[in-house]
């Protein structure tokens, strides 16, 4: 889900638990949406892109988030909610060699801190790769257009062969 407009930070800030203002370029922050009774509805990570916030939900939660955000944009707010789920594909790359594999695909990951992202290309396809907090090793989420998803997956898989990359369903682990 993307949130555009001058009020994007304030809207997310007032509707969730974390401070969502004054974010650096490509910085990501986790936040939680709760009910009036303090029950957790969803945990998301919002990344500050050039002209919008890219909000990554838990699997299957994007329709709820889109509707929730749209219901809470008030008169005077400068905001527009766009659900890009149908046009994008998300995959993961995890493990000790994840950084090396992405670098071999042409993604300059050195210097990308945890909870930050980078725009790049893999096999001439535009991607946005976000470094998640390390669980046991390097952990990346890679978003690309659906039409480029197979090409990106194949390029990552090919680069990973020398490093023991093993695909695991919709996610790629090594």
Task: Locate each region found by the language model.
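Basic, glycine/lysine-rich polyanion-binding surfaces/domains
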Residues: 1-174
